[in-house]
Amino acid sequence: MNLNIYQLKKKIIYRSNYRGTKEMDKLLGAFTNKYINKLNNEDLINLEKLLNLDDNNLYNFYNGLKTDIKIENNNINLLFKNFKYE
C-alpha cells in the first residue's frame, strides 16, 4: 500500500490512540501527538513499524524491561524509550 504522508500520519495517529490497552493508548497517543509533525519520512516508517509491535512488548521496552522480541535501534525507538509521559 502506497500512502501519501498525510494519509500515513492519519493512520499512525489513529493506531497510536486505539491500541487495545488504555495505558498504551495514552502513552503512544501522547508520544505521537507530540512528535508526528516533526518526523521525516524515515521516522514515520519506523514509527509505523513500532506500532506493529504488541502492547506487552512495547510497554516492557518503554519501561526498560525484558521483551520477547528484538527491537531494533533507531531514532524513533530511542525517542519513544526516553519519552516522558505527563
What are the residue ranges of the model-derived segments?
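Positively charged, polar, low-complexity stretches
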Residues: 2-44, 48-86
